[in-house]
Amino acid sequence: QKMGTGPWTAARVCLAAVGPTEFAGWAQVGDEYRCDENGCNCGWVYPYLPGEPMGRRHPSPLIQIMATSDDQVANIWRPLVSMIGLGPLKDLLLPRGEFIRIVGTSGDKDMDRIDRVTASAQSRLGAPINEAFFDETGLYTKSNKLIEVFTTMRRGAAAMGGRSMETTNAFDPAQNSAAQQTQESQRSDIFKYWRDPDLALKRPDGKPFSFQNARERRKILSYVYAGAAHINIDSIEAECLELMETDSSQAERFFGNRLVRGGGSWLPPGLWEGCHASAVASAA
């Protein structure tokens, strides 16, 4: 929560739109990437090392950004538009209200663009996209029908040899969200980044720290927000204390980065899985 994933994703969108994200062979002595040869006048030049993978722009990018609502999409869209207006990409990326035109080479009005997708705005769903960005996938569930939208966009990207990326707060393990399905997947081609405090912080007896313990909670927050200079831990802890008065598990998920079931759970975490026949057999 409040780590700045929206602006970070916006930067990734810019890269997917006009950056050297497509494999262009292996570098030899003297090879380099020059922005001025790719429509950008920022003057940046990158000299490749021999044997290094080289990159090129996608010739006809079609990118979609998805979230649960317009307000949620705006967490990425606002910084994206600001980056374009205040940086060197304003000649390559042209905001047009509900979409952003990418100055490309295909000349196809249905390509070379960045679109926004929400539960209520799915008109471009099913398009052959090359990159998809999903925000707050911990809220995409079967009940709100966002799992279906999520998988449809994933299929569209896969068909074009594209990629997808998710950002989210820690999910509720009782909801079987898109984020949970991705986290639990065993596929080796999925990169997952999650600072799990329970793997790094333990008591002498091996038990995880308690979020109810003030000293241990502070250590959890310091670990989770390490490297985020813009975060004030005192402010985060104050918000935690207030939220814990009404929903302690939500405070642990949002700020402690822990996978904690909501207050309405009918079983403690791990109890059902631990009683599965295979688990009992392995413990015997």
Tell me what each language-model feature is:
Residues 1-284:
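Phosphate/NTP-binding elements of NTP-utilizing enzymes
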